[in-house]
């Protein structure tokens, strides 16, 4: 029995991440869309390097941080994917992994850490608490999702998510980085935090 249809990869949350064929087609369109061929090839090279050497800054406040530590163990080797260089300083990090509940008092600190990161920077919301507030959603002092103050690039659901879910989310971020236009701007949107309005 032969399988004729390729498996589709679920998107998180962008529709252009349907499968590898559409991603390759999008990259070809970007390279042939009247842009400089040299810059297109240079974009591919730079984005390949950036996507395979993402340095995370972990902002862990609950059980998702414990699951993130399992990624560095021998069973789940982060070095295979280029995430092994976890940073303690936001000035040396490419992405921030928000793992856990964010309270209203903690939100300005998280925003300050995000602002200290160099561009291009990425945000990964890990676990139910960071994605939507989790079991503390109705509480008066909990932020209902990190996307209220930061532009989230990838959501990793779960309470806590398994290490495989971490890797799936990180690979989605790698795919997003690979199709960005490094020379001539990135496809970013900035958010104004609710507590600063």
Swiss-Prot record:
Q: Is RNA-binding tagged as a keyword?
A: no
Entry EC number(s): 7.1.1.-
* Cellular compartment(s): Cell inner membrane
- Which reaction does this chain catalyze? a quinone + NADH + 5 H(+)(in) = a quinol + NAD(+) + 4 H(+)(out)
| One GO molecular-function entry | NADH:ubiquinone reductase (non-electrogenic) activity
The record, for InterPro entries, names: NADH_UbQ_OxRdtase-like_20kDa, NADH_UQ_OxRdtase_20Kd_su
What membrane topology is annotated for this entry? Peripheral membrane protein
Where it mainly occurs, coarsely classed, is: membrane
GO biological process, alphabetically ordered = aerobic respiration; electron transport coupled proton transport
| Cofactor info, note text | Binds 1 [4Fe-4S] cluster.
- GO cellular component terms given for this protein: plasma membrane; respiratory chain complex I
Please give the cofactor(s) recorded in the UniProt entry for this protein: [4Fe-4S] cluster
Keywords, A to Z, come to:
4Fe-4S, Cell inner membrane, Cell membrane, Iron, Iron-sulfur, Membrane, Metal-binding, NAD, Quinone, Translocase, Transport
Q: Which family does it belong to?
A: Belongs to the complex I 20 kDa subunit family.
Q: What does this protein do?
A: NDH-1 shuttles electrons from NADH, via FMN and iron-sulfur (Fe-S) centers, to quinones in the respiratory chain. The immediate electron acceptor for the enzyme in this species is believed to be a menaquinone. Couples the redox reaction to proton translocation (for every two electrons transferred, four hydrogen ions are translocated across the cytoplasmic membrane), and thus conserves the redox energy in a proton gradient.
Provide the protein name: NADH-quinone oxidoreductase subunit B
Gene expressing this chain: nuoB
């Amino acid at each position: 029995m032969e399988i004729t249809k390729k498996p589709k990869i679920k998107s998180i949350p962008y529709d252009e991440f349907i499968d590898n064929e559409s991603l390759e087609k999008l990259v070809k369109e970007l390279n042939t869309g009247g842009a400089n061929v040299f810059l297109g090839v240079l974009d591919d090279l730079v984005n390949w390097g950036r996507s395979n050497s993402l340095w995370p800054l972990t902002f862990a406040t609950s059980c998702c941080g414990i699951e993130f530590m399992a990624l560095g163990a021998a069973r789940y080797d982060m070095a295979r994917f280029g995430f092994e260089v976890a940073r303690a300083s936001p000035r040396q990090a490419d992405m921030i992994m928000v793992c856990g509940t964010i309270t209203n008092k903690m939100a300005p600190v998280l925003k300050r850490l995000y602002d200290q990161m160099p561009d291009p920077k990425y945000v990964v919301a890990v676990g139910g608490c960071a994605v939507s507030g989790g079991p503390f959603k109705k509480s008066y002092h909990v932020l209902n999702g990190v996307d209220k103050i930061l532009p989230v690039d990838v959501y990793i659901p779960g309470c806590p998510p398994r290490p495989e879910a971490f890797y799936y989310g990180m690979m989605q971020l790698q795919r997003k980085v690979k199709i960005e236009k490094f020379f001539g701007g990135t496809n970013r949107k900035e958010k104004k935090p609710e507590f600063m309005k």
